Amino acid sequence: MSVLSDFRERYLVRFWSPLPALVALGVASAYYFAITGTFWAVTGEFTRWGGHIISWFGYTPQEWSYFKLIGLAGTPFDRIDGVMIIGMLLGALCAALWANNVSLRWPTSRRRLLQGLIGGIIAGFGARLAMGCNLAAFFTGIPMFSLHAWAFMLATVGGAWVGVKICLLPWLRTPLKVGSQASSLFGDVEGTRRRASLQARLGTGVAVLAIAFAAWRFDTSLVLGMAVLFGLLFGGLIERAQICFTSAARDLWTTGRTRAAYGILLGMAVACVGTFGAIALGASPKIFWMGPNAILGGVLFGIGIVVAGGCETGWMYRAMEGQVHFWVVGVGNVIGGTLVAVYWDQLGTSLALPYP
């Protein structure tokens, strides 16, 4: 095997260990905060996308209290969160293509699509009620030293336990379909090679497109260009290491495996050091209300991600791999977050705004 082939097999095709990847994500998230002034987060931007869609029907969501709080000016191409998420999706797609890991995959049961939609809505609603998901109210929220993130983390773990119990109900269990895979494994080696070669070329094309997109944003703003590059890094890391906080939380209650949870804690510990340094140098931390919204939102988020089968990072990279189920989960996330914006005047005044 040539040096180039060995490099490709080791670093582009094989999945990476999640532990060092999570540490790298912790380091990168701290630098992202220091450079852009905001934390690595996604559900706020997804809610803005919902606001844009609502505006197509003649409504004025920019006048709603929630969008005055999180902002709705411009387009996803003009906002730090927007271009970062586009970078994440491109980075995950590029990594999956280079690994020959992209194919259109439908769930074995249509019931799973409905389950993904409902779970996505619950998770999106809980995330925006708590002002953050497994990123902004957990992985990057705790390093901000915001008390609400600690409450959200504990509530999410409890919600994941409830979600596991719900998924074990007989009417939610999907029957296994067993079949022979011998022909697909051994019958068309040459076809598999051609497919891998095509996907590698497509991955390179996506990488070129991503670099061009970053250059376009750099032409407007240094911060926007850097946000694209960080998004590419985030997306590539989560796809190669298959980072999913849902799996980590679910495994605590089903198999007792803790390796992913340890990796998340270590990544947050590293991020705490970097984030503290950025704050000491003058960056403003993102602090949110420590109210019932953080606890209720965490419980709902924990239930939702287990029912849906993936958290924010999990569904994003799986969607780029061609898993249709997670396209539906993403749509559910946008719907759930937007529902919080619709009802924020009632929710916020009772669950969030009166609290420190």
What positions do the PLM features span?
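Membrane-interfacial helix-loop segments of redox and metal-homeostasis proteins
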Residues: 1-356
